[in-house]
Amino acid sequence: MAHLLGGETLHLEYPTGVVFDSVTVGVSEGDRIGIVGRNGDGKSTLLGMLTGRITPHAGRVTRRSGLRVGSLDQTDTLDPGHTVGWSLVGDRPEHEWAGDARIRDVIGGLVADIPFDAPVSTLSGGQRRRIQLAALLIGDWDVIALDEPTNHLDIQGITWLAGHIKQRWARNAGGLLLITHDRWFLDEVATTTWEVHDRIVEPFEGGYAAYVLQRVERDRQAASIEAKRQNLMRKELAWLRRGAPARTSKPKFRIDAANALISDVPPLRNTVELSRLATARLGKDVIDLLDVSVAYPGSQREVLRDIEWRIGPGERTGIVGANGAGKSTLLGLIAGSVTPTSGRVKRGKTVRLSILDQQSSELDAVAGDMVREVIGRLQTSYQIDGKDLTPAQLLERLGFARDQLSTRVGELSGGQRRRLQLMLVVLSEPNVLVLDEPTNDVDTDMLTATEDLLDSWPGTLIVVSHDRYLLERVTDQQYAILDGRLRHLPGGVDEYLRLTEQRAGSTGSNAPAVRTETAPPQAKSGAELRAVEKEISSIDRSLAKLADRISGKHDELAAHDQSDHVGLGKLTAELRELESQVADLEARWMELSELLE
């Protein structure tokens, strides 16, 4: 495919050390690339070099002539003196921009709830972020670079954005570079994943699920990779393969290999044992919301109404809802910081509740202390999976380096503060744990470690998040706040999205517009679909036979006289031919599978 943008032998270093050393990467027509890695390893820096915002100390960035590159970084670039409308479409007359289906789609999908004439200076940080993203998407770009675009978006907005990107930067059309900690979004959008680590950029085929599979295979083969990190990713892979087998488009030949890889991985959670422990710690009564409604002083509108929810011991519940729907108010009722206007909240006598909020205000009091001093005041050990861990070991498990223990709390990055905050909450030994947007300021490795920690936590868990991957991973049931009411979602997040679409259609609200730039592909007939399925089955059988032949060829190589270089060369050539046949069949399998989607 045609080259669009790239970097050749890029080198960048700061006084604190080398960030990238001789890195070569490229973006071709149709690439949708997700960039992952630990916070601080250089993801945003890489994006800055490729978009021209940061100049490398050595190497060069190449661009196709006339290439249009748009980027969204994490700085606020809006002019507070402008209105929302000006920030989005400038001085273009309304009849001009309103007649553009793409502009209507972007405005409806991201900022329909923000008045066009509102001054930017009156907006919240989340609203300003959405305006920035919408203004970028309204423009015309060949390559677009997005740094954490899902920040401040609710689940509907994230789902809309994924659909918009896939339609607009489709296969063989333009290029996308994406940094995100939202693993569902990454898996939905990316066709290639770059992992930034140890001053290099390592490419992987596919989205997040395929990246996890390949990373596990890499880690198993590389003896230098630490066992702890490998086990975490194998556990993550186990959930991906058991809980959502459609997440990766690998053919059955590869899926069988993945299943063999995780055959000895135990279930993520022993739900029976965790429920028993939770009941022992909590008793049968936890928190009951009985016919609860909340209206704030001076307002006739009820934020929540007629809420009836009995929270049981050991339940793991996810809460979803649009921004402003009342999720924080619901958490306030559970925590006791919000008083209901009517109804009552009944709390069990043994309940010890801790909440991980978005402010991390509890760290302000210890801002001048070193991390080791803070954890030195805590209990000496914490048990996970039957093992006793010290607070320092627990922090390491959450991605803290030992040399960071001497850092003062006030000097920690946002992600480091989040790690420390989570550890302090867990070590306070609550039996009811509430997590309010726990994915803010953390990378995918930290999220995986957090999920691993929560797997062995035996209390009642309530999670409010726009990160559907996290919700589906750590909770067993989901509820939504819709029109001020709490509704159970037996079908999970997908059911919530269907309900919001139905409500938008029935009320005629300014919901995300239907994209009309391209006509949908014509549906295939039943006979054509059967022919595709038949060919896929044939390929599966051929791949299975080739796998046996490849295994046999490896055995022949191992048993052959190692001094017979001619014979070894012949066997190796035969092996390469078999592997080439596998690659061709897998490529055809992928083409056919897309026809069935």
Model-derived segments and spans:
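Alpha-helical coupling/stalk and coiled-coil linker elements that connect catalytic or binding modules
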Residues: 236-245, 273-279, 287-288
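Intracellular alpha-helical coupling/juxtamembrane segments of multi-pass membrane proteins
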Residues: 214-257, 261-265
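ABC ATP-binding cassette signature C-motif
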Residues: 1-224, 278-597
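Flexible, solvent-exposed coil segments and beta strand-coil junctions
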Residues: 268-270
